[in-house]
Amino acid sequence: MTSFYIMLLAAYLIGAIPTGVVLTRLVGASDIRNSGSGNIGATNVYRVAGKKLGVLTLIGDALKGAVPVLIAIKLTDLGDAQVGAVAAAAFIGHCYPVYLKFKGGKGVATALGIFLVLSPLAVLGAFAVFALLVWKWRYVSLGSICAAAAIPILVYFTEGNPALVATTMFISLIVICRHHQNIQRLLNGSENRFKA
């Protein structure tokens, strides 16, 4: 049981590393929290600091979710529910990082990393939803919200594991809730469109 609590703490601290803030500081760019949308995630980094840093932020944020879950699965004897808790801890770390006074990102990329480990097949379906919506309407937020809503259903049909379904439902609900401002902007027509 001690190893489980250590894994939870480690997952949270790894998830809390603010990839976008670190990368933009390393290249001498402005504080991402004070630029663009103010979000620390890959989309805002892409808009403010360019494609390269945006992609690196996406990869880094995804790895923050994937690595703790992979370690929990491959190097420990934790059960499915405990692995789900480790995944949730990494995700919460990104959304509420101790290093930034608990003001973090929306969790999409970190959730992606987690889901890629837990259910890669479901991710393919969710990515199709995301890509179609972004291609059609150019709203990353809309694609993210709808993909988050879809993935628990996809996990249910591809995995059928109650613990994994519960984990994805928990993470997806937070992702959607953390897009509340985007939802408001989508409704009033003021949301920023993605430009390649």
From Swiss-Prot:
GO molecular function, one term: acyl-phosphate glycerol-3-phosphate acyltransferase activity
Keyword hit for Electron transport: no
Membrane topology reported for the UniProt record: Multi-pass membrane protein
UniProt-listed Pfam families: G3P_acyltransf
InterPro entries xref list: G3P_acylTferase_PlsY (IPR003811)
GO cellular component: plasma membrane
Predominant localisation class: membrane
Signal peptide bounds: none
UniProt subunit comment: Probably interacts with PlsX.
HAMAP family for this protein: PlsY
The protein's name in its UniProt record: Glycerol-3-phosphate acyltransferase
